[in-house]
Amino acid sequence: MQRLLLIVVLAWPMLAQQSAPAIAFTSVPNYPNLPDGMNFGEVPGVAVNSQGHVFVFSRSNSATGPAFGAAAAQLFEFDQNGNYVREIGKGLYAWSEAHSVRIDKDGNIWAIDKGSNMIVKFNPQGRVIWVFGRRQEAADGAEPLEHPDPPLPAVDGLFRQPTDVAWDSQGNTYITDGYVNSRVAKIDKNGDWVKSWGTKGKEPGQFIIPHSIAIDLRDNIYVGDRSNRRIQVFDTDGNFKRMFTIDVQPDPASRAVNGVTPTGERLKSVIGQPNAMCITPGPNQVLFVGESTFPGRVFKVALDGKVLGVIGRSGRNLGQFSGAHALACPSDHEVYVAETSNWRVQKLLLH
C-alpha cells in the first residue's frame, strides 16, 4: 500500500497545469419545453432513462411559489423531445432540499434529498417502493440543515446530507453521504446495509464532501471528493485504488456569475472541483466532470484521468455554465447539464 500511495503522490505534479482542447458543441435552445407559467428553481439534478426521457430535480415548490430550505424539491419528467410529461412525488414527505436524481438499469428513479437526509426509490410508474434514511419529525425545528460542532458520529442506515447514488453490476447501491458523514455507503440488492467507508480528511480514502459518484463497467467506483479537488477510485469493497485531479487553467476572460471571481490561492482551490460526474455507456467509456460554480466548465476525461477536452466556461448565456451540479451522459456526444446558479438544464450536442 505504501508503494502504491507513493506512486500516486508522485504522479500528482505531472497533472499540474494540464492542457486540453476545447470541444465544439451546441446547446439546444429553449430546452426543455416548459408549460406556460412553469419555471425551475435551482436545478441540482438531471438524469436520462433508456427511452430518452429526462428527469429534472428542481429546488422549487408549486404550492408556495419560491421556496427555500424545508420545502424546495420537485421532480419532473420530460419525454425524448423535451416535452413535459408529469411531476413525480408531488408533496412527498421526503421533499425538503433536492440534491440529485439518477435512473438505474431497470428504469427505477432514485431521488436524493439533502435536506431530509433521505433517498427515495420510485418505480418507473412513479410509485415509491424503497425509502432510505429518515427526516426530522414534523414537530422538530423548521431548519433542515443543522451543523452540530463537533459533528455527531455516523450511524449505519442513516444519512446526513447525502449527495448522490450509483450501482455496480451486481445490483449493489452506493450512496455518497456527503456533507457531514464524509463517507460512501454500500447497500445490497435487497436494500440491506452492507458497510460504509471513509471519514473526513485529506488522506487517500478520506473525503471532504464526497459530492458525486459513478461506476464503470469493471465496477470501479469513482467518487468526486469535491473540497479535496480530486476524484478517488475504489473497488466494490471500498479499497482505495488510485486518484487523480483536473488542473486545466480557466480562460482569463471568465467571470463568476455570483460573487467575486476567485484569484490566486482561492482560484487554485476551485479549479477542477468535481461537483458532478457521469460515465457514458458502451465499451469505450469516458467520464464527464462538471466543475463547481467557478470556473464552471465541463470536462471530458478518460477513465485513467487524462483530460480529453473542455466544454464551455462560466457565464449566464446558452453554452455557458454556473453551478454544474449534475450531469447525465446517455452517449459520448450528448450531455445534459443541471445548473444551480443559472436555474436550468442544458442539453449539449458535442461535435
Cite the ranges covered by each PLM segment.
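Eukaryotic scaffold repeat domains enriched in small/polar residues
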Residues: 17-351
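Bacterial N-terminal signal peptides
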Residues: 3-13
